[in-house]
Amino acid sequence: MAQDKFKRTKLHVNVGTIGHVDHGKTTLTAALTKVGAERFGGEFKAYDAIDAAPEEKARGITISTAHVEYETEVRHYAHVDCPGHADYVKNMITGAAQMDGAILVCSAADGPMPQTREHILLARQVGVPYIVVFLNKADMVDDAELLELVEMEVRELLSKYDFPGDDTPIVRGSALKALEGDQSEIGVPAIIRLAEALDTHIPNPERAIDRPFLMPVEDVFSISGRGTVVTGRVECGVIKVGDEVEIVGIRPTSKTIVTGVEMFRKLLDQGQAGDNAGLLLRGTKRDEVERGQVLAKPGSIKAHKEFEAEVYVLSKEEGGRHTPFFNGYTPQFYMRTTDITGKVCLPEGVEMVMPGDNVKVTVSLINPVAMGEGQRFAIREGGRTVGAGVVSKVIG
């Protein structure tokens, strides 16, 4: 019990492995748990246990993901590893496993491969903020110049997708050797260096409570003699009685004052991230607010109609469409608490999108919705999920 309490004092950070198939992501994940367990306690997870990743559902999509934990001197890491390429794509787009940073695993023997590139691009598109590189299988390369070359290639690739390639930590090692307990430079010490790189290169994540206030509107009702109450779950920030908020989305933005905060029918001084709250709004009529809008700190979020997004389209087996869709496809986009119709514009040279594909699209909604980059959404047809996406850029 005492140990459990002690654990909470360490800062919690979410990471994951990305990179090409067979470059050693799962072996590295196992090595991190082993070295972590030996140094700071915790549980060693063997390769087979991680590889047999259980299936989960996120936004109606089934994804195989393995979750492991390990500790460093200053942090507690929750780490995700996916068995297949398709699982990575789905994971990153749905945000099923939010990452504060990623470990890019690249084989020193092969150098960057197609999925290396695709995972870096996806990391950029979906807003993974930091990448640390592990150059794996370094024991298979005798030529020091070749190692330098591969390292340069990886740095160039990172820079190409707007990561700081020149300043990114690249650790050379062998995950397999580390698992075997090898104490040479590329064995266990390499894993320790990688853990240190995670500690120093990935900054402390910003907590939801420290961000500007935002609450998606789920329900609106009027209480006679008191006014209009809006209910929802506070997504981020803190709201106090007397605070000014903006009502954003669907209609022109308006301002009001919060005159009461309630939770479970009790009056409070404030509500914060994670709370299911009811907010009493001054001088706002019942028909001036609707589900799908958000209440937010003034100036912190704007409503947009047009945006670029990275999208994953469910396969037929996943319960998605049985046929491809084309330019001008008009499904519903489910963002936070609202379904809103939008038109899809495909990139030049892409004629159609097959179920199971991932693609970058431009979307035009019929009404503006409060959103920013990194906003996740589901794509639905008649209430059935056919895809998932994340806003990579707002246009207008």
UniProtKB/Swiss-Prot annotation:
The keyword Hydrolase applies. GO terms for cellular component: cytosol. Residues 10-206 form the tr-type G domain. Its main location: cytoplasm. It comes from the Bacteria. It catalyses: GTP + H2O = GDP + phosphate + H(+). Residues 19-26 are annotated as: G1. Residues 174-176 are annotated as: G5. This is Elongation factor Tu. It comes from Xylella fastidiosa (strain 9a5c).
